[in-house]
């Protein structure tokens, strides 16, 4: 389990989460340092009791990743945590990214998949979250997508992306396809932050998966609209290309700090889906079956 290259297909998977992340220096806000072990450990135990078996952890290089924290969570809760490798988005790149050759960036990712992360036994199971800016893919971001493609071709591990406010998903897919990536091995993140159905249908038609992974962040986009968009996807028979998550990133998101907590997805959002006419099989498809296929 400690290598986390595979997931437990018997339970649910939260496809885009953070257990330890620190963007506080970028955002000048201590709330953006998610590191409270006891609270997070408690929430993972709650999720485990609700049938969740896997957390796909999206904190990559220079985002405050902590591999020992993840290993401890697995040991203390039984939850499987799949770690990632890569770089996030232009505004968060360290200075050396600009001058580092694409091939070297790719090799860093390959090493974290095949050897381990920062000297630990934890190996990355996914290349993520590879990001783009709002309405643009910068040249350095394009270089990072190229590096991710090389790492994918070398290791076979899937790619999970970050779109800023649900923009540039189609452009990300075009870039990855040009670099030889089979799009069925790509999931486009944060597709649920605006009215986005036309693009979602086009991305699924290209073979990619899409994530509704900011569930509960009603200040960005209301969950009722997420349910409505998922309803349209269901009516077209395309839920087999959808995965769900919450993208917890702040201390204030944790239940112990007054936030919704990780279990909001199951205790609040899933009931909204069922009330809207979704079946339990639909829920299982998005939370269990699709991740079991994609993250294999």
Regions found by a protein language model. Give the residues of each.
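Histidine/acidic-residue-rich catalytic or RNA/ligand-binding cores of hydrolases
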Residues: 23-27, 67, 93, 169-174, ...
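Mid-to-C-terminal alpha-helical segments outside catalytic/metal-binding sites
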Residues: 1-5, 264-296
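Structural preference for beta-strand elements that scaffold enzyme active sites
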Residues: 12-14, 53-54, 80-82, 124-126, ...
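Alpha-helical scaffold segments that flank or form the walls of functional sites
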Residues: 10-15, 20, 29-80, 103-122
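Short acidic/histidine-rich active-site segments
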Residues: 58, 213-214, 238-259
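Active-site gating/metal-coordination segments in enzymes
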Residues: 72-75, 80-155, 209, 214-219
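Divalent metal-coordination and catalytic microenvironments
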Residues: 16, 55, 87, 152, ...
């Amino acid at each position: 389990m400690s290598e986390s290259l595979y997931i437990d297909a018997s339970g649910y998977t939260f496809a885009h989460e953070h257990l330890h992340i620190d963007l506080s220096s970028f955002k000048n806000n201590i709330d953006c340092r998610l590191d409270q072990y006891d609270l997070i450990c408690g929430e993972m135990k709650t999720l485990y009791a609700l049938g969740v078996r896997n957390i796909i952890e999206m904190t990559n290089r220079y985002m405050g990743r902590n591999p020992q924290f993840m290993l401890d969570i697995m040991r203390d809760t039984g939850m499987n945590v799949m770690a990632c490798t890569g770089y996030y988005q232009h505004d968060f790149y360290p200075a050396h990214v600009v001058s580092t050759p694409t091939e070297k960036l790719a090799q860093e990712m390959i090493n974290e998949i095949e050897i381990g992360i920062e000297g630990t036994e934890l190996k990355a199971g996914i290349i993520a979250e590879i990001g783009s800016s709002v309405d643009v893919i910068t040249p350095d971001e394009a270089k990072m997508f190229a590096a991710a493609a090389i790492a994918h071709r070398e290791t076979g591990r899937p790619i999970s992306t970050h779109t800023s406010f649900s923009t540039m998903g189609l452009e990300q897919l075009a870039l990855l396809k040009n670099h030889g990536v089979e799009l069925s091995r790509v999931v486009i993140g944060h597709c649920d932050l605006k009215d986005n159905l036309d693009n979602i249908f086009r991305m699924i038609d290209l073979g990619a998966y899409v994530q509704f992974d900011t569930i509960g962040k009603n200040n960005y986009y209301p969950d009722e609209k997420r349910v409505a968009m998922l309803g349209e996807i269901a009516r077209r028979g395309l839920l087999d290309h959808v995965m769900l998550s919450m993208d917890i990133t702040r201390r204030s998101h944790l239940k112990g700090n007054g936030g919704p907590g990780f279990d909001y997805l199951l205790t609040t959002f899933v009931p909204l889906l069922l009330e809207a006419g979704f079946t339990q099989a639909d829920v299982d498809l998005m939370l269990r079956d699709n991740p079991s296929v994609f993250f294999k």
